[in-house]
Swiss-Prot record:
Reactions mediated catalytically: D-sedoheptulose 7-phosphate + D-glyceraldehyde 3-phosphate = D-erythrose 4-phosphate + beta-D-fructose 6-phosphate
Oligomeric form and interacting partners: Homodimer.
Name under which the protein is recorded: Transaldolase
SUPFAM superfamilies: Aldolase
EC code(s) of this entry: 2.2.1.2
Gene Ontology cellular-component annotations: cytosol
Record-linked NCBIfam families: PRK12346.1, talAB
PROSITE patterns for this protein: TRANSALDOLASE_1, TRANSALDOLASE_2
Enzyme class: transferase
Gene that specifies this protein: tal
Keywords associated with the record: Cytoplasm, Pentose shunt, Schiff base, Transferase
Length: 318
C-alpha cells in the first residue's frame, strides 16, 4: 500500500521547503523553496562549506568594498545552494529577494535581475527559477513588472485574501499562502485548538484556491508553513504544497488513506475589477492577523539575513 506521501503526490505537486540537499535527495520532490532562514541554516552545515568558500571568492573578484562583497557573497551563496538543489529536482527553485527590500519596488526588481543573472552565469535558465518576494503592495508591483519580462515570481508571506487577490490580478506565477503561521496567531488570540478541517490556515488557503479556480486565474496556489500533517492532508488537491523535511518524513512513515479535498471549479465567472492600491491597503489593514504576521515575517527574515551577513563578513575579513 502506498504511504501517505506517495498518495499525496498523486493529487498535488510536492515541493521541499528546505536548503538541505540531503533531505531533497531523500524525498524526491518536484521543486524546492528556500528563504533567508533556510539559507542561514544550510550555511551552518559543514558539508556545504565549499559553497560558502566559492561565494566568498567570487565576491572578492567583484568589488574591493566590504559591504558590497557581503551583499554579493550573500546572493551568490543563495544561488550556489539553488544550483545544487536543481541537480536533484526536475522542476524549479525559489530564491528570495532580501526581505529588507520588501517596501522598495525598484530595488526588489534590481535584486531579482541580479539573482537571475547569477543563475544564468551558472548555466541555469530563468525557466527553472522563481523569484520570491514578500506580498507587500510594492512586492506585488515588482512581481507584475518581472512577470511581464518573463521572470516568474513566488509571492510569499501571504496571509490574507486581499494579498492573494492582488497577486492574481498582477499575473503572478505562484503564491505561497502560509497555513501554520495563521494557525499560530489564532491559537494565541483565542486560546483554542483547531481540528485540521477547521484550521484557520486551511480555511484561508481553501478560500483562495476556490476563488482562483472560479475566476479562471492561472496563478499557482502553493500552501506553505505547515504545523502538522493534518493541515497537509486537508489541502490534498491544492496545486502545490511546500513541506519541510520533518513533515515529509512523517508523511512517508504514515499509511493513512487520503483523498483530494480541493477540486478545480467546473465553471468560471468573470474576474472582478482589479483592486486599487488604496483598496488593497484598506482590505489588508482590516485583517489584524495578516498585518501582524506579514510584519513579523519580514522582520524575522531580515534578522536571519543579518546573521548570515555577519558570518560572511567574518570570512571576508580574514
Amino acid at each position: 500500500m502506498a504511504n501517505t506521501l506517495e498518495q499525496l503526490k498523486s493529487y498535488t505537486t510536492i515541493v521541499a521547503d528546505t536548503g538541505d540537499i540531503e533531505a531533497i535527495k531523500r524525498y524526491q520532490p518536484e521543486d524546492a523553496t528556500t528563504n533567508p532562514s533556510l539559507i542561514l541554516k544550510a550555511a551552518q552545515i559543514p558539508e556545504y562549506s565549499y559553497l560558502i568558500d566559492n561565494a566568498i571568492a567570487w565576491a572578492q573578484t567583484q568589488s574591493t568594498e566590504l559591504e558590497q562583497q557581503i551583499d554579493d557573497a550573500s546572493d551568490k551563496l543563495a544561488v550556489n545552494i539553488g544550483v545544487e538543489i536543481l541537480k536533484l529536482v526536475p522542476g524549479r527553485i525559489s530564491t528570495e529577494v532580501d526581505a529588507r527590500l520588501s517596501f522598495d519596488k525598484e530595488k526588489s526588481i534590481a535584486k531579482a535581475h541580479k539573482l537571475v543573472r547569477l543563475y544564468q552565469e551558472a548555466g541555469i535558465d530563468k525557466s527553472r527559477i522563481l523569484i520570491k518576494l514578500a506580498s507587500t503592495w510594492e512586492g506585488i508591483c515588482a512581481a507584475k513588472e518581472l512577470e511581464q519580462e518573463g521572470i516568474n515570481c513566488n509571492l510569499t508571506l501571504l496571509f490574507s485574501f486581499a494579498q492573494a487577490r492582488a497577486c492574481a490580478e498582477a499575473g503572478v506565477y505562484l503564491i505561497s499562502p502560509f497555513v501554520g503561521r495563521i494557525l499560530d496567531w489564532y491559537k494565541k488570540d483565542t486560546g483554542k485548538d483547531y481540528a485540521p478541517a477547521n484550521d484557520p490556515g486551511v480555511v484561508s488557503v481553501t478560500e483562495i484556491y476556490n476563488y482562483y479556480k472560479q475566476h479562471g486565474y492561472n496563478t499557482v496556489v502553493m500552501g506553505a508553513s505547515f504545523r502538522n500533517i493534518g493541515e497537509i492532508i486537508e489541502l490534498a488537491g491544492c496545486d502545490r504544497l511546500t513541506i519541510g523535511p520533518s513533515l515529509l518524513e512523517e508523511l512517508a512513515n504514515s499509511q493513512a488513506q487520503i483523498q483530494a479535498k480541493l477540486l478545480p471549479a467546473t465553471t468560471t465567472v468573470a474576474a472582478e475589477t482589479p483592486l486599487t492600491e488604496a483598496q488593497f491597503r484598506w482590505d489588508f489593514n482590516q485583517d489584524p492577523m495578516a498585518v501582524e504576521k506579514l510584519a513579523e515575517g519580514i522582520r524575522n527574515f531580515a534578522i536571519d539575513q543579518g546573521k548570515l551577513e555577519v558570518m560572511l563578513k567574518a570570512k571576508l575579513s580574514n
